[in-house]
Amino acid sequence: MAQYGNQDQMRKTDEYGNHVQETGVYQGTGTGGMMGGTGTGGMMGGTGGEYGTQGMGTGTHHHEGQQQLRRSDSSSSSEDDGEGGRRKKGLKEKIMEKMPGQHEGEYGQTTGEEKKGMMDKIKDKIPGMH
């Protein structure tokens, strides 16, 4: 199929059919016909074929400077040390935490205080409810 009109007025498109704005100076011509024509040229590169098309480069994408966020499904890396602070868990503790069932040598809070329930915490915040 022959191309009609002035080639300078033709719109360029990328590999997805989106219009591409031309910037800068470019050289190259496309020639072709119904059979056996070749095409060369373009801003970044050309393709040759039956009808002579002008190419706009390759479709490879490199995202430099962007890092992919990776998350593991591991548990928390620290726990309460029983003295109001936090301490780092070891590998054994993380593995034991994931395993089902009772854990005999578990670390935990060793204070003798009674834990407050949700209602007790709310009542403590409301003035005059003591």
Curated annotation (Swiss-Prot):
GO biological process: cold acclimation; response to abscisic acid; response to water deprivation
Keyword Phosphoprotein listed: no
Biased composition (Gly residues): 27-58
Chain segments carrying region Disordered: 1-130
Domain of life: Eukaryota
Induction: By abscisic acid (ABA) and salt stress.
NADP is among the record's keywords: no
Keyword annotations from UniProtKB, A to Z: Stress response
Basic and acidic residues bias spans: 61-73, 92-130
PANTHER family: ABSCISIC ACID AND ENVIRONMENTAL STRESS-INDUCIBLE PROTEIN TAS14 (PTHR33346:SF22), DEHYDRIN XERO 2-RELATED (PTHR33346)
Family statement: Belongs to the plant dehydrin family.
Name of the protein this chain belongs to: Abscisic acid and environmental stress-inducible protein TAS14
Organism: Solanum lycopersicum
